[in-house]
């Protein structure tokens, strides 16, 4: 009987530890192409540190590639999955006969979902893009933000960022938005809906500073800081 009690207490401690882990706060930042997700993410990081003394880390495509490299995944294949590219004939041949680091695209997606989920469970991070909102939807401590703006504003933004013409910027936005939508669908099997997000902010009408202020206030109201 005593042994049963000890085992019970151990199991309870493990369960409570798991629950605490799931309650570590984190943010996902989704965006339409041309919106200032990286800028907002870095400003949020600085403001959270100023207010709490805690350094939240930014999770970008590069972060996930580093984690994938540590797991000895084929980085070319990982990049193709993250960029929502379809595998071609060469990849099919490699999958069948070649590089042992190649896995099925579904397996790679599952591994990447696990990487992102585990990062989110650790908490105190800002996940930029990568279908973060849907991948982490089951974690209660997440706050999911989407930045949006009218197309003309985004064209101007991208044109300035990349030093390209408005026509080139419009084509770039169309292509990138399509890739991001496909990535979301690949990871979730669902269409992108506003219901996945806690806050949707118009990046044209709301400045980056105001956006950070709104998100910080929301985090405080939800006891996430």
Specify the residue positions occupied by each region the protein language model found.
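ATP-dependent small-molecule kinase phosphotransfer cores
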Residues: 62-124
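Pre-Walker A (Motif I) flank of P-loop NTPase domains
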Residues: 21-27, 31, 123
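Short, amphipathic alpha-helical "lid/cap" segments that border enzyme active or binding sites
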Residues: 113, 208-216
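Short, polar loop motifs at secondary-structure junctions
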Residues: 129-133
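Post-Walker A helix-loop "phosphate-sensing" segment adjacent to the P-loop in P-loop NTPases
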Residues: 46-55
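Conserved phosphate-donor/acceptor-positioning beta-strand/loop module used by diverse small-molecule
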Residues: 140-160, 165-173
């Amino acid at each position: 009987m005593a042994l049963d009690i000890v085992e019970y207490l151990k199991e309870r401690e493990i369960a409570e530890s798991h629950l605490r882990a799931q309650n570590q706060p984190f943010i996902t930042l989704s965006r339409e192409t041309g919106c200032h997700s990286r800028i907002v993410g870095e400003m949020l990081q600085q403001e959270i540190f100023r207010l709490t003394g805690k350094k939240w880390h930014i999770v970008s495509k590069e972060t996930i590639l580093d984690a994938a490299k540590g797991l000895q995944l084929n980085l070319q294949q990982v990049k193709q999955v993250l960029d929502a590219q379809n595998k071609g004939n060469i990849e099919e041949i490699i999958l069948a006969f070649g590089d042992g680091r190649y896995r099925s695209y579904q397996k790679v997606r599952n591994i990447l979902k696990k990487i992102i989920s585990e990062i989110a469970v650790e908490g105190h991070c800002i996940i930029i893009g990568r279908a973060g909102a849907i991948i982490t939807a089951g974690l209660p401590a997440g706050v999911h933000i989407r930045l949006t703006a009218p197309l003309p504003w985004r064209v101007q933004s991208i044109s300035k960022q990349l030093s390209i013409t408005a026509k080139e910027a419009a084509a770039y936005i169309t292509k990138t938005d399509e890739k991001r939508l496909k990535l979301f669908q690949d990871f979730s099997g669902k269409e992108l809906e506003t219901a996945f997000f806690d806050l949707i902010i118009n990046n044209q009408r709301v400045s980056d500073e105001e956006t950070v202020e709104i998100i910080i206030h929301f985090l405080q109201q939800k006891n996430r800081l």
